[in-house]
Amino acid sequence: MSLYRDDGIVLRTQKLGEADRIVTILTRRNGRVRAVGKGVRRTKSRFGARLEPFTHVDLLLYTGRSLDVITQAETVRAYGEPLATDYPRYTSGTAMLETAERFTPMEKEPIIRQFLLLVGGLRALGEAVHDPRLVLDAYLLRTLAVAGYAPALDECAVCGTPDGAGADGAGPDGAGPDGAGPDGAGPDGAGPDRAGPDRVGAGSRSFAVPAGGLTCRSCRPPGAASPAVATIALMRALLRGDWAQADVSQARHRVECSSLVAAYVQWHLEHSIRSLRHVEHV
């Protein structure tokens, strides 16, 4: 058995025996690692609260037969502290942790870009400069991009025709609190098309999750959503990190953006992200 050192974000923990825990960590150099923290649940544990979710830790581990064992842990930054008293930020953070684990199915497969995205997302939540749901959606979109699943937002996802809808500007779209606009599209991005003049489907574009993003009129599949032009502009801004544009977006476009992003990420994961249910009810 060999010793190795790495740093990582604690994603989750689960009980093992009477005093131990299995800790799932997204590390900088070794990808996702599952390791045992011996005696963590004891009152006088030498690890204290260092192996709790949201904590960035520097670790010394040795390789075990099935699970590695944590022999030393030092806190680099406890991202959970500023989130614990802010429910919207906490729920967005838990959705990030769950997503990070879902996008790292293989253990000990280095994925430093996913690690850095998670660190940046948690830092942004803790700094409380931006709307936590915007931070979450930016994280989800960039995580998709790193994994090779970025939605097509500038051209048709099917035929590649460049998008011209973004120059039209946007007016009121009447989106309701459930993320549905006048086209009746729900969180899964599907519904009857009754697009107004400010909506993508009113010109040449719609958004279809199964197709991979925007679709032109010729490639539009049944049930495609007709989001507001400003909603697609917001998605573009979040994907490229344009916070000046994202921060001035209107609430109804943020709701619609979140619905599309949630549907898109869960489609590509082929698995629901349970934490998103709590975010949607904030």
Please report, for each region that a protein language model flagged, where it lies by residue:
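Non-catalytic alpha-helical scaffolds and adjoining flexible linkers that form interface surfaces
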Residues: 1-282
